């Protein structure tokens, strides 16, 4: 069947997959709901016409992210940039290629169900960087699971530019596997955790300073008055003052981060669907772990450490529900795929040992 790339049923489902860009922008919601789409489409159109980036002085901190995303998506073989939805077809294309590659390892009937998660259908149907982040993250995690040394580093470079926070969490997994032999035994993982804890304690002031910068920025962005609306007392109340406070806040808020929006917070049908999906995703992760008996695997433990680090960090700075539902999916989806791939990898290793 793999000589045909995909089977007939999958082919039919992908017809729907490629049509979904026509269902969201201007149909289910105003494209300004995901306003960053305009940055990527305008930049990609300019790059195609002039082979040089636009001046993005007005978007401090966005320049490199926008330009690199637009270069990659804008030069894929898709039709001309005729609307804000145009780059969505590039996102669909890279995820089709991703599916074909993954189907070599993961059964198609399981994989296609994962590709029909509502959030994946949504984000690949828009002109966003999110699918590109997930694309690079998945290849990074899988190549690291294969214990390749150079390819993951090459994939990490664009991630550092496009989404540096996620690149940080992913790099933890690379360090665990390559430098602490996290694929062989749990001993290296314990050593890594002890060293990491010691470094955080040693540089706790700098660590808390960085976390508070992100925490305050997202809190102010979500406030009615925006930036500049907080007085000194409000800023102090939001700031985390100690490592103990950081861990208490991250652990207690992690449930909110993983399950937001709760059904009673749903302002519309879209939020209600995301609330249900969050439960499905958590259930799916536990199902894969249990059915694949991954809890015996040091590689799984290494994956889990990097994932938990990402969840805890985001939990501390999560204020805007819409923004962090999006961040959560982009963080979790590559790990779901990696867990599925690891099941295949462990089964293959078991069969090899039995021969």
Positions of the model-derived regions?
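Transmembrane-helix motifs of polytopic, lipid-linked glycan transferases
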Residues: 74-75, 86-107, 283-287
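Short hydrophobic/aromatic helix or loop-helix immediately within or flanking a transmembrane segment
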Residues: 36-82, 252-253, 257-258
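Membrane-interface helix-loop-helix junctions at transmembrane boundaries of multi-pass membrane enzymes
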Residues: 107, 146, 285-306
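Short acidic/glycine- and proline-prone juxtamembrane loop motifs at membrane-interface regions
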Residues: 125-132
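Transmembrane and membrane-interface helices of multi-pass
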Residues: 95-96, 111-120
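Start-transfer (signal-anchor) and selected internal transmembrane alpha helices
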Residues: 1-22
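Alpha-helical transmembrane segments and terminal signal-anchor/GPI-anchor hydrophobic tails
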Residues: 25-41, 163, 169-292
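Membrane-interface transmembrane helices that cradle and orient dolichyl/undecaprenyl
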Residues: 106-108, 138-151
